[in-house]
Design a protein with these regions (language model features):
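Boundary regions of SH3-family modules and the immediately adjacent low-complexity/disordered segments
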Residues: 30, 34, 117-158, 164-172, ...
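Membrane-embedded alpha-helical segments of integral membrane proteins
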Residues: 73-112
Length: 214
């Protein structure tokens, strides 16, 4: 618990990175805090997309949850989009955009100020190639940033919550969810929130504790 207090102080101080969230997740996992451990491992993933240790520990933490939800199969287009998104973080894409901007400018400048035909073709080809990667990186980064703002995901911290067909208790009670389950928040109406889970099921919850990952 002392470690949890220490890491929380570091986060409150404005420091955010995968190692802090990963260690915080481990600390909660050792205390069998289901929702907290999953939440912080998911936060760590946002900063380090390709870290196997995070994925392994997250899988262990998910084994403590009550809800067993089979995700919907993904289309080839969606898998390809996720592949591009997971290649680099937004910060890494920003660096790549700056890098290819400089390379495009340098190669085009060398093309303009070089008099040898072979060299001009060489520099012009590389300037076009750099520009192509610049456009691709910018497009993927912009799309990823836009979707990240629109898609709000969170972890349920309530022991158990009921999911309703409409935002009132007179509607049909569809199913229940438990702590540690990851949901997507689609809409909100006063104290109600419309959520979606990995298998595509949707419904409304009221006064639930959902800690956003975004």
């Amino acid at each position: 618990e002392e470690a949890i207090t220490l890491y929380n102080k570091i986060i409150l101080g404005g420091q955010h990175d995968s190692s802090i969230y990963f260690n915080l997740g481990n600390s909660h996992y050792k205390l069998n805090n289901v929702a907290e451990s999953i939440y912080y491992f998911e936060k760590a993933k946002l900063f380090s997309l390709k870290d196997e240790d995070i994925e392994i520990n997250l899988a262990f933490a998910k084994n403590m949850t009550i809800d067993s939800i089979d995700p919907l199969p993904k289309s080839d287009l969606l898998r390809f989009r996720e592949y591009l998104f997971d290649l680099f973080s937004l910060n890494e894409y920003s660096f790549i955009i700056i890098l290819f901007s400089w390379l495009t400018a340098i190669f085009f400048g060398l093309y303009l100020f070089n008099s040898k035909p072979y060299s001009k073709r060489f520099y012009f080809s590389f300037s076009l190639l750099s520009m192509l990667f610049l456009i691709l990186s910018f497009s993927v980064s912009s799309l990823k940033s836009s979707i990240k703002k629109e898609e709000i995901f969170g972890i349920i911290f309530d022991r158990k919550i009921e999911i309703w067909a409409e935002p009132n208790f007179r509607s049909e009670n569809l199913f229940s969810l438990h702590e540690g389950t990851k949901v997507q928040v689609l809409d909100s109406l006063q104290e109600w929130k419309k959520i979606k889970i990995a298998n595509g099921a949707e419904g409304w919850i009221k006064e639930a504790i959902i800690k956003n990952l975004n």
